[in-house]
């Protein structure tokens, strides 16, 4: 209390000083005295602030807790908002109360202006925005620091004007602040904001006495001096303020009209949110702190009519009231209860949640608006581009007519005359100028558009520049007709430069096309200069266009007509589609049009054909008929000698296996099984519904089982719809069986297992005319037991491969369990059950896959050379149909081969395609069939890749490109070396098998061919005699060798190995290689020197000279008989050749590293013998004497006998002997 009394006494002294200062200023002589008291007043205020700081902090904390404890919420919202939100409201409320008393009005104006200064924390003249109120404690300091001035006449008017300007600034800045807060403010910032506002209110409440007193003093002073002129000035000021406010409102209205609808909504929502937040905050602050509104303050202030004594009394009363209020506040400061605090916290949490929700909604709405705007802009852009493209295309057409020489202006005629004159001049000089026809026609190259050549880019650039000029002309003509005569100065100069450059080059003069391009560019320049000429030219163009269109209708179907058709199609599609799908359609058409700009005629035709092929494929895929099924393709896989071909022979009633070389299948074969044969084979099956068989037959593919033919097994499995895996019941799963299982797994191909050779079970009684399940029941107990035992063992082996298996008559779920069918190819048991199961599974589970489709799908299986027919290809036709005369594209070794079908040959039903039969010739073949195709240039065809049919000539390049992609992988496998053997086989499949074997044996191959061995093949192989005679060999697999070719090979020294079984060929060739190697080793035995490093054992010197016999330790390498030795430390003295090596009195050929041996070194013939102790000593290391020839001989013929450490020693010795 003592502190407070002291403060009060200081305040009273302060007031006296202020009054004196004001009086001095009014009289006009107190200008100098004014500053000092004001400064002292500022200092005292600071002191007071420091003293009250602790109390203020406590007040803040307690008021935060009692946010919602008071019950009053919405009553005082308007009152609390009005003094802070708008200056307009303040003025209106003032006007109402000021009507009665002018003196009172003046005092209130002064008072209010001072209050505004305190609230907004303004300095003497500079206006600060209201937003500064957000900055908590800094604001309080400013509030206390502000010096108080007495108000003269001029000051009053200025202050009022400043206040209005400041209010406008404040309102704008508050809006900006609210926007920032709504977009990116967190909950914590809003709390800070609330606290700062509360702090300001507290300050206002805590110091009402001094403010009012100072206000009264000013009022008294100003009331005494006020004149009529001042009143008039104030009135004018108010009117001016009103006018400014009206202008500001009009400006805001205009801005709002300019904003788009989306932005309006956004700003409104933000504004409403901001007001709501401010109102809630203000209402809570007023309830908690009890701030006296402006109206109440005005009511409390005394009238201006009273004299100074009355004012003093009032001041004293106010001080008393202030003391009472402080006491009341202390009582309040005791704090709210825990329940109140909890309620307040919950309310705060709810408020935060509400703010976050509003923020999220606002963000979503903004995002939606942005997306809609982007979509609208994209649509506009696409529309614009479409229009531009149409214009551009029209210009292109006119340009083309001009380039063709149908429209010639005066300048063009002159240019042509010049070009003709230069041509004649060149011809007179004897230069041969090639004409267009004489030049060889360039083959069109289809490349990526990124890889364009520079001239093409330049051409397209010129064309685009000319198009831009044209477009500019049109714009000028349409938009600004006055400026038609004045062309832009830069562009024509550039065009003229390009013309001059073109004329300087005599090659450009010689080419008609390039001169026409230059002329075409000229036309566009002249068009701008002469608009009258342009109109005449346009009329001529229209006439020429009509004639051009007629010519195009008659002749050129691939050119502009195709483009027009494409346009029509795209227009129809666009008109039919909905609004949502439009952008994507336009995008795709954009890319087409853009690419048309710089494409050649061939490229346009290419794209047209590509589109046609895609459209046809799409139509075929839609028109799939599930009612009509094609024949399923069934592949037979398994290990060697499991009886694959024998099973098929039993089905076909043929003897193919007996006719094969060694009974081994080495080619892929196909058999067509008709429906009649299926019914015949399955007659013993009782529950087989023969009436409702939907498949027209079956196409069975037989594959080789040998290790080398993995390529053929792979090819066969990739074609088939379902497979038969043949397993020998006596041997179970074997290596190639497991390989086949993995192939089928990778291709996701369903299969059934034939447990073959059940006739080899002891005491088996055959019964081919009954079901195999019934046959098994009839067998003796020991036979049944053996069968069950072996079947279970095989089921376990399948489980090890990750497959569930069960006997077919016990299999309830064929989708998860593989069916095992016991069969015997010899007796015929189980064959009917096998066929029945295949038919059932294909009809039920594979009906979608077997649905009839017109889209051609065919694969080349084998390439064969047949006598009398030339090279033929065996094709499996999976879908669609083939006709005689069709243009086919097949993969070749040197690229795709285009040829025509000269003949379609089919083997008779139930006959093998690969076996020479009396083939039936057909004009048309439907799927699924194994077909032999006769045609031209099929020698270099590659098997295992698709066959394609071109229905129109322009489709050929498209289909070629498709095949090239698939060809790359196959061609990478066949890589020819510079040095190597020559390989020939009857089919590509067996050739691949042979090449695979050579690759694993590390034998290079330099040439391959399919078909019989001719003289030309021997000539090619004989080239190797010069390079490497060991590779002058022809490996002929399953092919005939012509007599003259054999004679030529004998005379040249070329070896021909021929065999019908691939393994025999392997054996013969490996034997030849070994013999050749031995022969060469004998030949190079004396040249090849093996590296060695030996140390002398001095205690074992048996003979020191001629021959030297001593004990040595082999430190590195290997010592062999015949190795020349030398001593590098004694100037490389040669001591002789190792003629004998002994270990424990036993003679050996080689001594390896680490062994201690006795060696006999004899002197080199013709040289004087060297002596131990004279020419070399025990400390010297002996090494073998190597040379470049010896190293080469080791590399070529003794590589197998060398180890890695030996090669390292050679490297070391090379440095010692300085061998390059």
UniProtKB/Swiss-Prot annotation:
Residues 756-759 are annotated as: G4. GO terms for molecular function: GTP binding; GTPase activity; metal ion binding; RNA binding; translation initiation factor activity; tRNA binding. Gene3D superfamilies: P-loop containing nucleotide triphosphate hydrolases (3.40.50.300), Translation factors (2.40.30.10), Translation initiation factor IF- 2, domain 3 (3.40.50.10050). GTP binds at residues 640-646, 663-665, 756-757, 759-760, 825-826. Residues 638-645 are annotated as: G1. Pfam families: GTP_EFTU (PF00009), GTP_EFTU_D4 (PF14578), IF-2 (PF11987). InterPro entries: EFTU-type, P-loop_NTPase, Small_GTP-bd, T_Tr_GTP-bd_dom, TIF_IF2, TIF_IF2_dom3, TIF_IF2_dom3_sf, Transl_B-barrel_sf. This is Eukaryotic translation initiation factor 5B. The gene is EIF5B.
């Amino acid at each position: 209390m003592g502190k407070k009394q002291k403060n009060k006494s200081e305040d009273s002294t302060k007031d006296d000083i202020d009054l004196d200062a004001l009086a001095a200023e009014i009289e006009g002589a107190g200008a100098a005295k004014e500053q000092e008291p004001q400064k002292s007043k500022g200092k005292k205020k600071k002191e007071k602030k420091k003293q009250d700081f602790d109390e203020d902090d406590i007040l803040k904390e307690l008021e935060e807790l009692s946010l919602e404890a008071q019950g009053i919420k919405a009553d005082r919202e308007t009152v609390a908002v009005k003094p802070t939100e708008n200056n307009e409201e303040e003025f209106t409320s003032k006007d109402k109360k000021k009507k009665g008393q002018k003196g009172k009005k003046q005092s209130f104006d002064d008072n209010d202006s001072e209050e505004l200064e305190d609230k907004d924390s303004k300095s003497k003249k500079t206006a600060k925005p209201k937003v500064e109120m957000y900055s908590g404690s800094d604001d309080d300091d400013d509030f206390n620091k502000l010096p108080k001035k007495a108000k003269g006449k001029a000051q009053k008017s200025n202050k009022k004007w400043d206040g209005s300007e400041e209010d406008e600034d404040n309102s704008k800045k508050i809006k900006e602040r609210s926007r920032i807060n709504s977009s990116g403010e967190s909950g914590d910032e809003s709390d800070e904001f609330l606290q700062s506002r509360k702090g300001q209110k507290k300050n206002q409440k805590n110091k009402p006495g001094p403010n009012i007193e100072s206000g009264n003093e000013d009022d008294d002073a100003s009331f005494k001096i006020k004149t009529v002129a001042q009143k008039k000035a104030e009135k004018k000021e108010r009117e001016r303020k009103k006018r400014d406010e009206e202008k500001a409102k009009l400006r805001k209205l205009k801005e709002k009209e300019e904003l788009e609808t989306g932005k309006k909504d956004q700003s409104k929502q933000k504004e409403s949110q901001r007001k709501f937040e401010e109102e809630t905050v203000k209402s809570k602050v007023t309830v908690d702190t009890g701030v006296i509104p402006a109206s109440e303050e005005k009511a409390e202030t005394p009238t201006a009519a009273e004299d100074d004594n009355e004012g003093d009394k009032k001041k004293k009363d106010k001080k008393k009231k202030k003391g009472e209020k402080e006491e009341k506040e202390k009582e309040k400061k005791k704090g709210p209860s825990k329940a109140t605090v909890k309620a307040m916290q919950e309310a705060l949490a709810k408020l935060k949640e509400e703010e976050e929700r509003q923020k999220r909604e606002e963000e979503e709405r903004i995002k939606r608006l942005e997306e809609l705007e982007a979509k609208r802009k994209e649509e506009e852009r696409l529309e614009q581009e479409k229009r531009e493209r149409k214009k551009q295309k029209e210009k292109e057409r006119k340009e083309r007519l001009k380039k063709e020489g149908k429209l010639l202006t005066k300048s063009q005629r002159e240019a042509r005359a010049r070009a003709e004159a230069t041509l004649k001049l060149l011809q007179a000089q004897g230069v041969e100028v090639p004409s267009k026809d004489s030049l060889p026609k360039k083959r069109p190259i289809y490349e990526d558009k990124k890889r364009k050549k520079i001239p093409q880019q330049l051409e397209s650039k010129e064309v685009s520049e000319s198009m831009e000029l044209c477009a500019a002309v049109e714009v000028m003509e349409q938009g600004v007709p006055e400026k038609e005569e004045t062309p832009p100065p830069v562009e024509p100069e550039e065009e003229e430069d390009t013309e001059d450059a073109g004329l300087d080059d005599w090659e450009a003069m010689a080419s008609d096309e390039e001169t026409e391009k230059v002329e075409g560019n000229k036309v566009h320049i002249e068009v701008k200069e002469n608009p009258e000429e342009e109109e005449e030219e346009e009329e001529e163009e229209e006439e020429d266009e009509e004639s051009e269109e007629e010519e195009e209708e008659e002749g050129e179907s691939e050119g502009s007509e195709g483009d027009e058709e494409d346009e029509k199609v795209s227009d129809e599609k666009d008109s039919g589609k909905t609004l949502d799908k439009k952008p994507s359609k336009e995008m795709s058409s954009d890319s087409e049009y853009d690419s048309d700009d710089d494409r050649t005629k061939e490229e346009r035709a290419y794209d047209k054909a590509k589109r046609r092929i895609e459209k046809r494929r799409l139509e075929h895929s839609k028109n799939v008929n599930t009612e009509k099924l094609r024949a399923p393709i069934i592949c037979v896989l398994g290990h060697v000698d499991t009886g694959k071909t024998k099973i098929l022979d039993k089905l076909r009633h043929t003897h193919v296996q007996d006719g094969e070389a060694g009974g081994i299948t080495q080619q892929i074969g196909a058999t067509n099984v008709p429906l009649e044969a299926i019914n015949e084979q399955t007659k013993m099956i009782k529950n087989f519904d023969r009436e409702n068989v939907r498949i027209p037959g079956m196409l069975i593919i037989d594959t080789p089982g040998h290790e080398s033919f993995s390529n053929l097994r792979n090819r066969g499995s990739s074609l088939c719809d379902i497979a038969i895996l043949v397993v020998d019941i006596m041997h179970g799963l074997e290596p190639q069986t497991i390989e086949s299982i993995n192939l089928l797994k990778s291709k996701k191909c369903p299969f059934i297992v034939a447990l073959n050779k059940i006739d080899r079970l002891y005491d088996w009684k055959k019964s081919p005319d009954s079901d195999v399940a019934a046959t098994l029941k009839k067998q003796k107990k020991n036979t049944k037991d053996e069968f069950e035992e072996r079947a279970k063992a095989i089921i376990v082996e399948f489980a090890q491969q990750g497959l569930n298996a069960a006997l077919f008559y016990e299999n309830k779920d064929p989708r998860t369990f593989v069916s095992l069918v016991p069969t015997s190819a010899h007796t015929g048991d189980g064959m009917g059950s096998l066929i029945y199961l295949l038919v059932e599974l294909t009809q039920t589970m594979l009906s979608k896959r077997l649905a009839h489709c017109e889209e051609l799908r065919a694969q080349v299986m084998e390439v064969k050379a047949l006598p009398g027919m030339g090279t033929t290809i065996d094709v499996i036709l999976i879908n669609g149909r083939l006709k005689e005369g069709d243009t086919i594209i097949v993969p070749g070794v040197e690229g795709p081969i285009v040829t025509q079908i000269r003949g379609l040959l089919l083997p008779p039903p139930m006959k093998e395609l690969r076996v020479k039969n009396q083939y039936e010739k057909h004009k048309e073949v439907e799927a699924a069939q194994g077909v032999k195709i006769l045609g031209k240039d099929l020698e270099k065809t590659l098997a295992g890749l698709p066959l394609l049919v071109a229905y129109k000539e322009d489709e050929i390049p498209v289909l070629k490109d498709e095949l090239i992609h698939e060809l790359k992988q196959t061609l990478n496998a066949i890589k020819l070396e510079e040095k190597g053997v020559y390989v020939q086989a009857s089919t590509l499949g067996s050739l691949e098998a042979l090449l695979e074997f050579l690759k694993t044996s590390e034998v290079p191959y330099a040439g391959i061919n399919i078909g019989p061995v001719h003289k030309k093949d021997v000539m090619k192989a004989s080239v190797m005699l010069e390079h490497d005679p060991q590779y002058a060999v022809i490996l002929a697999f399953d092919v005939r060798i012509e007599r003259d070719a054999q004679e030529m090979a004998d005379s040249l020294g070329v070896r021909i190995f021929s065999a019908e079984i691939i393994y025999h060929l392997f054996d013969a060739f490996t034997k030849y290689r070994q013999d050749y190697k031995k022969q060469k080793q004998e030949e190079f035995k004396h040249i090849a020197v093996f590296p060695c490093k030996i140390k002398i054992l001095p205690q074992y010197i048996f003979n020191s000279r001629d021959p030297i016999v001593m004990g040595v330790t082999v430190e590195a390498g290997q010592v062999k008989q015949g190795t020349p030795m030398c001593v590098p430390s004694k100037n490389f003295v040669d001591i002789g050749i190792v003629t004998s090596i002994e270990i424990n009195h036993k003679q050996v050929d080689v001594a390896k590293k680490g062994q201690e041996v006795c060696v006999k070194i004899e002197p080199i013939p013709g040289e004087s013998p060297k002596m131990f102790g004279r020419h070399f000593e025990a400390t010297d290391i002996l090494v073998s004497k190597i040379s470049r020839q010896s190293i080469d001989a080791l590399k070529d013929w003794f590589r197998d006998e060398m180890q890695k450490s030996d090669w390292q020693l050679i490297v070391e010795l090379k440095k010692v002997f300085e061998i390059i």
